[in-house]
Amino acid sequence: MKHGLGIDDSPEYKPVRDFVKTVQPPPSCKRYVEDHVPSALPMCAPHVPWLVAEASKVAASKLELGKAGPLEPQQLFALVLYTLDVRHNGGAEEENFFKCLNDKLRERDFEILQKLEGYLYFLMSAFEKLPPEPEETFFRGVPKSALPIIEENYKSGRHVHWSGLTSVSTDRRQAENFASQEGPGGVVFHVRARTGRAIFPYSAIPIEKEVILLPNFKAHVSEGLTKAGDFFELKLTEAREDTFVF
C-alpha cells in the first residue's frame, strides 16, 4: 500500500531539513506521538491510541527476542509505528499514519513538519542506523490512476527525484499487488538502487519485504514505459552524484 506514495506531479528535487542533526530529541517518542500527532495530522488522529499501543507491543516483542538489530528502543518504536496499517483498526487507507506523514513530507509543509520533528528525529535516525542494501533491483507498484503523471514525467533518459520516503520491495509480487489495486493497467517500477534501507525485519508487516528509499532519491529512467501483460513496466537506475558545477 505504501508503494503508491510519492508520485509527484513534478518529480524534482526539494530541499528538506536534516532532522537528525538539527532536532533536540524528546525524552519519549511514544509520548511525543501522543502529544503532537493528533493536531498535526488530524486525518489519522482517531487511530493514535491504537498506533501507539500496537507499536509498543511489536517493538517490545522484537526487543525481547533480540530482533532489534542496530536500533535503539526509541528508533525501533518509531519505525514500527510507521509501518502499521490502520485498516486493522477499522480505519480507511487514507487515514494511515505513513500516508498522512509522507504527504506533508512531500509537500515540505514546514509548520506541520516542525510539529512532527521529534518523531522524525527518531524515524530518520533509525534509517541512518540501518546499513544500505547492496545494489540490486527492487520493485514498486502504483495503480493505473498514476499512469498519466508517469507518462508525462518518466521519459527515457530523464532524471527524477522522489521527494518523500519511498517504499519498494524485494518481492515483485508485492509490487504487482499494489499495481493492480485499481485493476489492470497499473505500473511496476524496476528500481536499481544502492542506498535502500531494508526495514522489513523491524516492520509490523514483514511479509511486504519493504525497503525504504530516503527523501530526494534520485534516479534516471533507463527504460521507458513498456506493456507487459496486465501491467506497464518502467526501469529506473539510481543516479550517481551530480556533475554540474555552479
Q: What would you call each of these model-derived segments?
A:
Residues 1-39, 43, 199-246:
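Conserved NAD+-utilizing ADP-ribose enzyme module
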Residues 41-202:
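Internal glycine-rich, Lys/Arg-flanked active-site/core loops of soluble domains
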